[in-house]
Amino acid sequence: MSTAVTMLTDTWSRRAKRFEIEGYAKILAIGTATPANWVDQTTYPDFYFRITNSQHLLEHKEKFRRICNKSNIRKRHMVLTEELLKKNPNLCTYNDASLNTRQDILVSEVPKLGKEAAMKAIKVWGRPISEITHLVFCTTSGVDMPGADFQLTKLLGLNSSVKRLMMYQQGCNAGAAMLRLAKDLAENNKGARVLVVCSEVMLSVFRGPSLQQEDNLLAQCLFGDGSAAIIIGTDPRPGLETPLFELISAAQTIIPDTDSHLKLHVREMGLTFHCSKAVPTFITQNVEDCLVKAFEPYGISDWNSIFWVLHPGGNAIVEGVEETLGLAPEKLRASRDVLSEYGNLTSACVLFILDEVRKKSKKDEQ
């Protein structure tokens, strides 16, 4: 298990403008997208056990209902529809071979959803698409060659010379990792404009319930579909580009002896999910040490003096971090809002939260 910390400066705030430094990477635009289809978390247990032909598992269903009720998730967007599931019944069992079915859907839907977010970011940016020099694409599922980065290049009509990087199966830490990678690319390639796209369709983990693998219920409760795109570059051109955030530094820390507590494996049945009950505890016990290492060089030790873009791996993690660090309730409001409205969006989640922080900052400035 690893934690990633990216220090961002809100360039709308008067205080932050002191830190605008030539050559540092800046976020120039953000765009997000979700599938039109969505599910209500309160009624989802009924739908889930009906569509998977598992209504006879009454105790299991009630347990799932309790998990959903405690999740602080109101709704989730999904590519999966009842019609699609009825056409592909092998997706609704726990362990039927279904990888081919999943792949056929994912290799099409992941780039398409990514395009929606990218087009929104490009519109906000306001510059010609031909000025994009680099593309970094990230997704947890749908491994294929040519990859989703290549497909998106065609969908957007990017230059054939655009420098592409495809990152598969990096999980929830990938959102912050993409910021770190894009920062390095922008700061080491003068004039670069890096398009980062995180597109997640969690069809890969959808499956029927299992009495032997109860953490599968957590996956069925938690994950949603969505894509987010950002454009990053240095030295924005006055009057042509508007910086939203500045990326000051990035750090990543591995928590020892935790690799067995959170695992996803590709199998014939799709992507299996294992999460031990100790994960929130590991995070809350180690979060402050990670923050000290990241922020000490900048003289920051008051965790309420900074703004937060916390990946909400689950409600227990959000509450644990808040309590451990003594954070004021408003510090993690954006994380809670995104979790409530979309669920855990894996790599795209922190970018959705970053956009929420941007919207609130802009509103406060006005």
Curated annotation (Swiss-Prot):
It catalyses: (E)-4-coumaroyl-CoA + 3 malonyl-CoA + 3 H(+) = 2',4,4',6'-tetrahydroxychalcone + 3 CO2 + 4 CoA. Pathway: Secondary metabolite biosynthesis; flavonoid biosynthesis. Keywords: Acyltransferase, Flavonoid biosynthesis, Transferase. GO terms for molecular function: naringenin-chalcone synthase activity. SUPFAM superfamilies: Thiolase-like. It holds the Pfam family Chal_sti_synt_N. This is Chalcone synthase B.
